[in-house]
Amino acid sequence: MRYYPAPLDHAGVEEWISRNLRRYQEHCHGLWAMILKSSCELVGDCGLTVQDVGGQREIEIGYHVRRDLWGQGLATEAARACRDYGFERLHAGRLISLIRPENVPSRRVAEKNGMTVWKDVMRQGLPHLVYAIRRDRPVEE
């Protein structure tokens, strides 16, 4: 994945699965599989994860879509569903997306989801933009 730190080895995959299981145990949410309706094929993941941003707990909308399906609106559809779930079911006051500045396609998804740049942060030694949307500022779609 182009904007992900690095591909995971076997141990990294096991740790990633364990981390996601813990997220469900602790927060009752995490990442969900993205399944293409027309073929029932796994095409990515999306969901809500708790992130530490400058010492503050934030709920992040995240998404990963298989590269050959980029540009078809799948990430936007998934991000909007996550946004609605976060506000309606989790009653979050704010949702964020952490995005590398050069990841223009992901930035477009965040903007289509009603998000705007809130601040800049460093994560894993790399600059990231924190896109955010507040529940009290409804989105016009």
Model-derived regions: residue spans:
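Active-site rim helix/loop that mediates acceptor-substrate recognition in acyltransferases
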Residues: 9-28
